[in-house]
Amino acid sequence: MVSRKAVAALLVVHVAAMLASQTEAFVPIFTYGELQRMQEKERNKGQKKSLSVWQRSGEEGPVDPAEPIREEENEMIKLTAPLEIGMRMNSRQLEKYPATLEGLLSEMLPQHAAK
């Protein structure tokens, strides 16, 4: 037999999941401080990369980071699977944004018909 505490915990988790699926509010994944730290890491990574480009150029002096290096010229990113973007909306959301949805559909339908 299952204990009452386990049933109560599962019930609380279920109710929280139902509320989370019905809410339209934005819940931030990262705090503001975490975002700042991640942006700082990205800036530092970019500075390190530009330094390594300069070191690879040898005695030629600083290289413009916008110029591709011979090794990087031949690199190409290829998608291995088709990419599809979609969204789910419940009936309340559909009733709330009819004009926007009509505009999006009118833009997308001619594009698909042309293909």
Curated annotation (Swiss-Prot):
Gene: MLN
Subcellular location: Secreted
Keyword Glycoprotein: no
Top-rank lineage group of the source organism: Eukaryota
A cellular component term, taken from the record's GO annotations: extracellular region
Family designation: Belongs to the motilin family.
PANTHER family attached to this UniProt entry: MOTILIN, PROMOTILIN
InterPro entries per the UniProt record, alphabetical: Motilin_assoc, Motilin_ghrelin, Promotilin
Reported function: Plays an important role in the regulation of interdigestive gastrointestinal motility and indirectly causes rhythmic contraction of duodenal and colonic smooth muscle.
Listed GO MF terms: hormone activity; motilin receptor binding
Keywords: Cleavage on pair of basic residues, Hormone, Secreted, Signal
Annotated stretches, region: Disordered: 39-72
Pfam families registered for this protein in UniProt: Motilin_assoc (PF04643), Motilin_ghrelin (PF04644)
Protein name per Swiss-Prot or TrEMBL: Promotilin
Record's signal peptide: 1-25
